[in-house]
Each structure stands twice: as C-alpha cells, then as structure tokens.
Amino acid sequence: MSSYFVNSTFPVSLPGGQDSLLGQIPLYSSGYTDPLRHYSNAATYGAANMQEKVYPASYYQQTGAAAIYGRAGGGAPCEYNPVGTFYKETEGSCAFSSRDDQPLFVTQEHQQRKVECPEQSVSMGSSIDDKSSTLIYPWMQRMNACSAGPFGNSGRRGRQTYTRYQTLELEKEFHFNRYLTRRRRIEISHALCLTERQIKIWFQNRRMKWKKENKLLNPSKTPEEEEEAEKKS
C-alpha cells in the first residue's frame, strides 16, 4: 500500500483498454504531488500544536490527586493547595483517622506537631499520677467532731448532735459549774471527744435555757440579780 502511494506511475492493468488513461490522470493535485512531503508536514504540524499547548503545574497535581483520592461512589473534586499538603487536619488529633487522610507531602510544621503531641500526653499523664500519689495527712483536713470520724467531715458544718453519754456528762458539769474555765473546758473536750467550741456553745445554750426556767419560777427577780446570783453560785 505504501509503495503504491510513493510511486504514482506504477502500471496497473485494467480491463477494457484503460491503461493509457490511468497513466495520464495524476493521483494527487499539484499541491500534493509528493505524498512523503504531505505526511512530513502533518507530523510537524501536530508536534507544533503539542508544544504550544502547555498545562499549568496545578493541572498535573489535580489529576494525580484525583487518581489517588478517587473513590468508587465518586468523591468531591480535589482542590489545589499552594502549600503542597493534601491532608485533612483536625484540631487536637495527633494521628490520622484513616489511610485516605495521610499526607502526600509532609511539611516541617506537621512533623514538629507530631513530635509535640507525645510529649504533651506524657506530661499530662505524669501530672495525673502526681495528683493521685499525693498524701493527705490528718492535720490537712478539717476536724469537726470525733463522732463523725477520725478526720471529720470536710463539708458544710451542720447542727451538732450529742450522744446520751455526752449530754449526761455535760449536765453533771453544768449542775456544779455554770461557767467553765479554759483549762476545765480542754479537759472536758478530751474526755468527751468534742471541741472546745462545741462545749462553749452547749454551755451558752444551757444557760439561756436555765434563765428562762428561773424567770418563770421567780418572775420578781431582775436580770441583774439573776446574773449576780449566778456568779455567786
């Protein structure tokens, strides 16, 4: 076939005596007499077009990313990132969620962040261990009453309740002494496992009750006389 186009004067036998006409009629026009020249021009024309059509660098990156990140169901189009990173960054996460989120180009900032994350986790773990290992001594806690426990309750102070034994001993002491000295108050607090403040408040309330009872029994006495009588007694 190629030899036929190269040599246009190749003799061809036709029926009916038309051989002379075939030799006189040219196969190509005057502009395309040489078939080899025609094909060479076409090749140079195609090469020139290919050289003139230049694609930007982002086009190749998009096509490469589309081939890598393409999914079966069809995914969102890839966006060009001038920094050169094709990964989804989430706040507070040190590892990638899946294989698709792994970066194609890892920057220096990303490497530093991966190094800092284990250090932060180690420091947080050490601080938690330090808090859990701290010792709490008895003198560091509030001491309200011995009946509530050896270290007392650290919550809000409520109404103090006394046992029958404590109330009986306090009534005996009040019968003999309506006012207590500091030394006697310390002795009673150690004996009854109470604080000095609790004993002081109990004696104040008991004196108020005793005054009301005496006032009902002896309404003629004035408060001054009652106080003098209490001091004398």
UniProtKB/Swiss-Prot annotation:
Keywords: Developmental protein, DNA-binding, Homeobox, Nucleus, Transcription, Transcription regulation. Pfam families: Homeodomain. One of its GO terms (biological process) is anterior/posterior pattern specification. One of its GO terms (molecular function) is RNA polymerase II cis-regulatory region sequence-specific DNA binding. It is found in: Nucleus. Its main location: nucleus. Residues 213-233 are annotated as: Disordered. A motif (Antp-type hexapeptide) lies at residues 136-141. The keyword Transcription applies. Residues 224-233 have a biased composition (Acidic residues). Residues 155-214 bind DNA. It comes from the Eukaryota. GO terms for cellular component: nucleus. Sequence-specific transcription factor which is part of a developmental regulatory system that provides cells with specific positional identities on the anterior-posterior axis. Belongs to the Antp homeobox family. This is Homeobox protein Hox-B6b. It comes from Takifugu rubripes (Japanese pufferfish). The lineage of its organism: Eukaryota, Metazoa, Chordata, Craniata, Vertebrata.
